[in-house]
Amino acid sequence: MKFTRTLVLVSTSLLATVATSQAQEVKRDTKKQGEVVLKPITIISHGKDNIEATGGTVLTYKDIEKLQPANVSELFSRQSSIAVSGGGGPSKRIHVLGMEQSNLAVSVDGVPQTATSWHHTGSNVIDPAFLKRVEVEAGAAAADSGFGAAAGAIRYETVNALDLLEPGKTFGARIIGSYGTNGRGFSGSTAAYGLKDGFDWLLMLHGTSGHNYKNGDGTEILGTEPAARNILGKAGYEFDGNRIDIGYERSRDKADRLIKMNMGLPGDTEYPLEVARDSVNIKYTRTDATDMWDPEVQFYYNRNDYWRNDYQNRTNGNMILKEDLYGGKLQNTFTIDYGKITAGIDFGKHDYNTDNYGHNDRRYRKFNTQQVGAFTQGRFEFDNGFSLSTGARYDYSRFADWNDEVFSDSGASVNGTLSYKFNEHIEVFAGASRTWLGYVLGDYGYVHARNNAFYTDPTFSPGRARNYKAGVNFGGADWSAGITLFDTRIAGLPNYDSQKLGNDPEEYRSRGFTLNARYIWNYTTIGATFTKAKVTAGDDPVLPNSGSFMPIGDMATLFIDQEIPDYNMKVGATLAWAGRISDEAATAANFYDQPAYTVVNAYAEWNPPAVKNMTLRVGVENLFNENYYERTSFAPSQNRGGIDAVWAPGRTFTFQTAFKF
């Protein structure tokens, strides 16, 4: 019966795509790719999904330049639907609607990223200094978003030479230096880029050096010193209508950190930790694409390393984790009368290696997963006011564990979002998806503390997810607003108990609504967001233990940006609020109630008329020195002799100077 329902969903989705594709071929839109005409309430624009129109988040290069984020907490500071836990860079965990980003299909420049390796580490995958765009597709994700998009997708895109070069120039450089109080210390970013005879290139370096910060009460928070050393390199070549892009990203963070970076234990001590990531990718596209031939071919390799020295003669976080992820994607996009259809295949292999320094009778473990999938996604705008984004994918998944036991299965995923625009000011939409996740390994770092008898349950099965959303968008020439109701359910996740790897019997669920509004008047932009979410495991609220699912309750943001062209100045501020959380399940598990907090950030930026290529900026985070821990952090409790949160920084000033040549 389950297979029949899936088959019906797949058939319906494919029939919608095929039927629409029978339309006559028309001339390709001559607008620049990615350009969006100001229609703030339509879910499809130029054959692409409008992520914001269905409750998602989009940060453009202009948005990121305004924020100048030093970390991912500041990157998402204006989004109430996205919460980032505190601490040092490697400890930050990103949750979307209360679900950790490992439950979403995460990519950087189209390259799939590994999930969070251990429940005491962070989920940060990219240096904000390299970013030009971020898309967070919450809920029902498109089939071409990638494999395993249980709760949506996060797409990070980094800058290249063509983004930074001034019009008419073939070479450029950018230097940014800053100093911050409260342990932030020094940060420097240098970039050089050029263009010659169809060849463009970019090299960017970014590093930070500081000390542990203090919270709003003046207490030093151990293990929080900035220590990033990152490199981004890109090259592209265009010839005879072809384009080849090659990218390399390298990130290193080496410093003394807490044993478990997301929680404060009694008598906590710092120990050396190194987190490393390397990513290489090559992509082929056409610059003279036609309606029927618009290909994209990409191959990639990712490596992630986690190294904690052998500081104790027992399993307590001292371990080595190594991951290798490699694969590719081949797809083509067809342009027809009413939109676009993308179809293709993707594949990947993920190798895992663990070493617990021999503090058990099984020191080393090696295991892997493999995936191959085929997908199609259509995005259509019709003349009668309807828009439709619908697609399907079919995947094969294989898991070979540390005992050479092999598990394999296959399954289908479908999605669809339909909207109707009553006029230029009102649009309603509804969407749903059913996603097959393959074998989900999740926080595989648990195996470092398991003995040789640890095995995989023979009944271990693939995960699955369901998403539903509906909403209304309103808008005009200078304003927009919307409400989105969402309901996400994920089941079949892994459970690493003391004896075996099996399936968690609970279904995890996040449901609620989001609100957003924005108004632009001359040189002023004002925006606000509000999110209310109930996150449960089975019938019970999830515990605030920094897991893959976290309670977020009520959260809101308010921001304003003001340009003052007569003085070459820009100023702005952001207010973030989180409501109090108190529930019986958390109290019974010895957690304290989570207090409400309000945090204000502000900035001022000036371009001196005498030095037009220089920008001076001063920013302040936590202006009123609030003592708080960010929502989705491990909450204080009475367990283990008293667990404390990793508190967020107190008031921090940052002074920045930037030159562009």
Swiss-Prot record:
It comes from Brucella abortus (strain 2308). One of its GO terms (molecular function) is siderophore uptake transmembrane transporter activity. Disruption phenotype: The mutant is unable to use hemin as an iron source but retains the ability to use ferric chloride and the siderophore 2,3-DHBA. Exhibits an accelerated loss of viability after 144 hours of culture in low-iron minimal medium. Exhibits significant attenuation in murine macrophages and is unable to maintain a chronic spleen infection in mice. Residues 1-23 form the signal peptide. PANTHER family: HEME_HEMOPEXIN UTILIZATION PROTEIN C (PTHR30069:SF41), TONB-DEPENDENT OUTER MEMBRANE RECEPTOR (PTHR30069). Residues 170-661 form the TBDR beta-barrel domain. It is a multi-pass membrane protein. One of its GO terms (cellular component) is cell outer membrane. InterPro entries: Plug_dom, Plug_dom_sf, TonB-dep_rcpt-like, TonB-dep_rcpt_b-brl, TonB_rcpt_b-brl_sf. Residues 48-159 form the TBDR plug domain. Its main location: membrane. Keywords: Cell outer membrane, Membrane, Receptor, Signal, TonB box, Transmembrane, Transmembrane beta strand, Transport. PROSITE patterns: TONB_DEPENDENT_REC_3 (PS52016). Belongs to the TonB-dependent receptor family. Induction: Induced in absence of iron. Maximally expressed during stationary phase when cultivated in low-iron minimal medium. This is Heme transporter BhuA. Heme transporter playing an important role in stationary-phase iron acquisition and required for maintenance of chronic infection in mice. It is found in: Cell outer membrane. The keyword Transport applies. Transmembrane segments: none annotated. It comes from the Bacteria. Pfam families: Plug (PF07715), TonB_dep_Rec_b-barrel (PF00593).
